[in-house]
């Protein structure tokens, strides 16, 4: 006889609660919506305001929640166990925090980031075609902010930041900030975006794709130095 199906973990039994509900007009387009949402989030990291990023992150979490309600739970992988463990520790720390309001705010922020992770994991597991599209979104955002930052050198430099360290040979050096209003923030964004552009340049095929990755790599590296 066939072995009895293993019941999903108690924590995941809510998933698939709406699997038998009538499908709406957007049910067949969940992958498209999730992909566009994640691409907009990745590309908009250096371009969108903090309020805009908050809306994109919240929308990503809500979209994952709707997708999870219509998808039966699967096996909990090793990485997801670590993620659930971190979430459990965060909930425990929030409960024992001497400043519960601030701790609760931090917990909500963590859960919103985990919602983005969960949506990305779900999308890439069911539609791997979005891998390259999401990866391309981050260098696209870095390319735009790098161009804006480099152009700042050819405009009025009176408002640009300058290196303030009298003991350094770089004292007084002009520092660009692109769309992020702070050279350190621009450098912090470019540090992970540049390796992704390099990987894309080595992996992608086609002249247009490679030219895009090369432009993001070269201009991002130049902007990083100029920060």
Language-model features: where?
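Membrane-embedded glycan-lipid processing machinery
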Residues: 100-108, 176-183
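Transmembrane signal-anchor hairpin modules in multi-pass inner-membrane enzymes, especially those
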Residues: 1-105, 115-139, 200-212
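Alpha-helical transmembrane segments of multi-pass inner-membrane proteins
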Residues: 37-42, 58-64, 91-92, 115, ...
